[in-house]
Curated annotation (Swiss-Prot):
The gene is asnA. Belongs to the class-II aminoacyl-tRNA synthetase family. AsnA subfamily. This is Aspartate--ammonia ligase. It comes from Malacoplasma penetrans (strain HF-2). One of its GO terms (molecular function) is ATP binding. Signal peptide: none annotated. Transmembrane segments: none annotated. Pathway: Amino-acid biosynthesis; L-asparagine biosynthesis; L-asparagine from L-aspartate (ammonia route): step 1/1. Its main location: cytoplasm. It comes from the Bacteria. GO terms for cellular component: cytosol. InterPro entries: aa-tRNA-synth_II, aa-tRNA-synth_II/BPL/LPL, AsnA. Keywords: Amino-acid biosynthesis, Asparagine biosynthesis, ATP-binding, Cytoplasm, Ligase, Nucleotide-binding.
Length: 326
């Protein structure tokens, strides 16, 4: 297969990003908004993702302010739905750039994260699996559209097409199917079989007493969330492209804070307002920009489609394998 040069790769990245965001905005009726690069500290707005990852923080001494770099914008977006008075069944999306300093680095994990962060205003009565599945299918169709257009533009990629439909499976059903496997092994097995899956229910304990994966307790409802995972034929592995979910309401927030021993968060501004029903009900998520490009362009390493910071061993390994990191 022909390998794109660095310049050709940069052009292809722009092509994919332009195509995806236009179709995402149209399909979900999203308005583009400007994402913050810094957030106020100690307000509960930033996300600790799996519950333990700490954001990069700083103090501007001369200005008397302190801030932190976003890790994701899940809670910020929900606040903005209200602040911007976004109508029902419309939403927002932003180009989110984040630093996750505690990330374990790999060929698909970087401390730099770029994604389309989106949030859609829904009714409380729409907080259900049917709503979740409808939105997942729309996003999956856009991923398939992008794959078709990329393969048309770069003809040597015209192989290993994603299936027409995405397969839904709950994390509990996945556990029952592969009881002696780890969650990551289960993901690999189910992705290799169906090529595109959405695993429902991430964060809460399963019947074996452990969660499929960790999720912070204060943005997704653990019963109504999940991940879009595809089979990456280039690397023969499962690849998560998007994490999304129906957001917590005033009841599920309290339940999940209690389950995760995070009741102290009820005193933070964001959590107080949510418990008092001051924010719109919503569904939202993030779609990895670099991951999508990495997948569609058949790359070996995420660093081929994004500029980040890498330790010496990863740089040496890439050079040895003739992988050109940006």
């Amino acid at each position: 297969m022909y390998n794109l040069s660095i310049l050709e790769t940069q052009k292809a990245i722009k092509f994919i990003k332009d195509l995806f965001q236009v179709n995402l905005a149209h399909a979900l009726k999203l308005h583009r908004v400007t994402a913050p690069l810094v957030l106020e500290r100690n307000k509960g707005i930033n996300d600790d993702l799996n519950g333990s990852e700490n954001p990069v923080t700083f103090t501007s001494d001369g200005n008397g302010i302190s801030g932190e770099i976003p890790q994701s914008l899940a809670k910020w977006k929900r606040m903005m739905l209200g602040k911007y008075e976004i109508p029902l069944h419309e939403g927002i999306y932003a180009d989110m750039n984040a630093i996750r300093k505690d990330e374990s680095l790999s060929s698909i994990h970087s401390i730099y994260v770029d994604q389309w962060d989106w949030e859609l205003h829904i009714k409380k009565t729409e907080r259900n699996l049917e709503t979740l599945k409808v939105v997942v299918k729309k996003i999956y169709e856009i991923i398939r559209l992008c794959q078709k257009e990329v393969n048309k533009k770069y003809e040597w990629f015209a192989e290993n097409l994603l299936p027409e439909e995405i397969t839904f499976i709950s994390s509990e059903d996945l556990l029952q199917r592969y009881p002696n496997k780890t969650p990551k092994e289960r993901e690999r097995l189910i992705a290799s079989k169906y090529k595109a899956v959405f695993i429902i229910g991430i964060g809460d304990n399963l019947s074996d007493g452990k969660p499929h994966d960790l999720r912070a307790p204060d943005y997704d409802d653990w019963k109504l969330n999940g991940d879009i995972i595809v089979w990456n034929e280039t690397t023969k592995s499962a690849l998560e492209l998007s994490s999304m979910g129906i957001r917590v309401d005033e009841v599920s927030l309290v339940e999940q804070l209690d389950k995760s021993n995070n009741n102290s968060r009820k005193e933070l501004d964001f959590h107080k307002k949510l418990i008092n029903k001051e924010f719109p009900y919503s569904i939202g998520g993030g779609i990895g920009q670099s991951r999508l490009c990495y997948f569609l362009l058949h790359k070996q390493h995420i660093g081929e489609v994004q500029s980040s910071l890498w330790p010496k061993d990863i740089l040496e390994e890439a050079e040895k394998n003739n992988i050109k990191l940006l």
